[in-house]
Amino acid sequence: MTETNKKIFISAGESSGDIHGANLMRCLLERNPNVTFYGLGKENMRQAGLHSLHDMSKKSLMWLHALTEISTFWKIKKECVSFFRRERPGVVILIDYCGFNFHLARAAKKLGIPVVYYVCPQIWAHGPWRVKKMKKLVDKVIVIYPFEKSFYDKAGVPSVYAGHPLFDEIS
């Protein structure tokens, strides 16, 4: 993200991602109060300052529910890609839910927009072969478990260990 482009696109599909996204937004705003957030989230992210492209509060991005609304999610993806083309955000931050967010990552990469994945999908447990896809689609991952950093480093995916957001809230 450049000094002149302070637009951040951020996408969280599930309620837990919405909480993590809101916390991340607050942290980024503390560092730079001139940043503006656009994207997909729910109530927590809207309260933290998200300019929502689509009301996701009644949408479920969990696997079985998402299948029943596939045409809706296709339209939402198209809205996001139009936003990428029109507004050219400085960075796209994706939170969990690779089933939808990988599509956004692919579109952003094609347009030359940097992609950061925060709270990565647990591909180390549910399909380690997908790390190749992650390497192609993202510029950096921000991981929450210490072992994830070495997993991504070995695969050649630039990574930063941030710690688990829940542990920060507890301590």
Feature names for model-found ranges:
Residues 6-171:
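Active-site and donor-binding regions of nucleotide-sugar-utilizing enzymes
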Residues 1-3:
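Short, flexible hinge/linker loops that cap or flank conserved catalytic cores
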